[in-house]
């Protein structure tokens, strides 16, 4: 296999002038600076394909320690390549969003209700309750709810799904820090959306070394009302999805979607230098081109933290970052 653990970083791009504001946001979720580095515009162009001076801060949550997964990298550019994915719907080609768990979804929703309310390009989903069993059993005093409660918040700075489990647990899939204001975990899973009717996880299994996660085998979905509300789907809009993990790693998972309906293609807004969530990274055994059959736009060099790294485009059009260990 190539990856040494689950998904390492969620990479967010911002203008350099927004650094302190975004550090404060992530600090509220328990992500604190762990390392800082920089690249010149020339070196950033060579590795990331965007020619602007770059300073990056790697942010760590206490839950990252278990498997070196779920960190945040804040890339602060002198000039952005574009305005990114913003609050576009979840299921568009090229979409990304970050998932994390919480022990208090209501506290998060209360604080998100008016957060950044001065901007138009924002979306806070309703609070969605998704029973684990299908068909769902009746919820009574003697038979409490068992499932997930979820709310998604998208704006130009980022796209995050906050999820609370009820009545069950998945040990190791997100490590919640109950000392934090929002009692949340590190980033537990990442999401990508392939082109319509083009579901294919073979590349991620064969080249990344990922495998289908327990309870996450490939299946069709979209006809359940909670899923429709969470993902802003219309009746009849179905999709295929699979959850992938690094072997023996219970967190840092990758969820791969492909709609059965036509969607806009936003892959151009989903790459380094675009505002907001613009990339994901994995730690790997080798960043050599030989380890990456089938990719395009391969670039290699030292990243802003002085680590051996490469970037490339997967066959589904997604940009990825690998870091050598």
Task: State each model region's role.
Residues 260-263, 269-282:
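Low-complexity, glycine/alanine/valine/leucine- and proline-rich hydrophobic stretches
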Residues 80-93, 103:
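Post-signal peptide N-terminal segment of secreted/secretory-pathway proteins
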Residues 47-50, 86-90, 142, 179-181, ...:
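Short consensus segments that form the blades of beta-propeller domains
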Residues 7-8, 93-97, 275-277:
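Eukaryotic phosphotyrosine signaling hubs
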Residues 61-77, 95:
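Extended catalytic-interface subdomain
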Residues 8-10, 188-190:
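Conserved GNAT acetyl-CoA-binding A-motif
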Residues 2, 13-68, 192-251:
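Core segments of cupin and vicinal oxygen chelate
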Residues 1-3, 11, 36-38, 45, ...:
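Vicinal oxygen chelate
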């Amino acid at each position: 296999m190539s990856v040494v653990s689950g998904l390492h970083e969620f990479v967010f791009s911002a203008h350099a002038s927004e650094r302190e504001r975004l550090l404060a946001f992530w600090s509220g979720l328990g992500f604190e600076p762990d390392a800082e580095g920089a690249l010149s515009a020339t070196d950033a162009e060579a590795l990331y394909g965007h020619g602007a001076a770059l300073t990056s801060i790697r942010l760590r949550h206490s839950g990252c320690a278990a498997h070196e997964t779920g960190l945040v990298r804040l890339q602060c550019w002198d000039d952005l390549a574009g305005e990114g994915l913003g609050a576009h719907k979840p299921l568009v080609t090229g979409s990304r969003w970050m998932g994390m768990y919480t022990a208090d979804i209501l506290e998060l929703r209360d604080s998100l209700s008016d957060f950044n309310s001065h901007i138009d390009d924002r979306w806070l989903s309703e609070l969605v309750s998704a029973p684990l069993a299908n068909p769902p059993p009746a919820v009574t005093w003697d038979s409490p709810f068992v499932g997930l409660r979820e709310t998604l918040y998208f704006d130009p700075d980022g796209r995050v799904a906050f999820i609370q489990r009820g009545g069950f647990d998945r040990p190791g899939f997100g490590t919640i820090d109950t000392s934090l204001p929002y009692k949340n975990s590190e980033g537990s899973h990442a999401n990508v959306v392939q082109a319509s009717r083009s579901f294919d996880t073979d590349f991620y299994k064969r080249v990344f070394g990922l495998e289908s996660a327990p309870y996450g085998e490939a299946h069709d979905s979209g006809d359940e009302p909670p899923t429709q509300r969470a993902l802003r789907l219309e009746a009849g809009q179905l999709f295929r999805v699979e959850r992938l993990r690094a072997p023996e790693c219970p967190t840092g998972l990758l969820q791969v979607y492909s709609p059965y309906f036509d969607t806009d293609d936003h892959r151009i807004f989903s790459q380094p230098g675009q505002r907001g969530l613009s990339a994901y990274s994995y730690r790997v055994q080798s960043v050599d081109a030989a380890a990456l059959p089938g990719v395009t736009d391969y670039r290699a060099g030292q990243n802003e933290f002085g680590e051996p790294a490469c970037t490339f485009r997967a066959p589904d059009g997604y940009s990825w970052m690998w870091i050598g260990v």
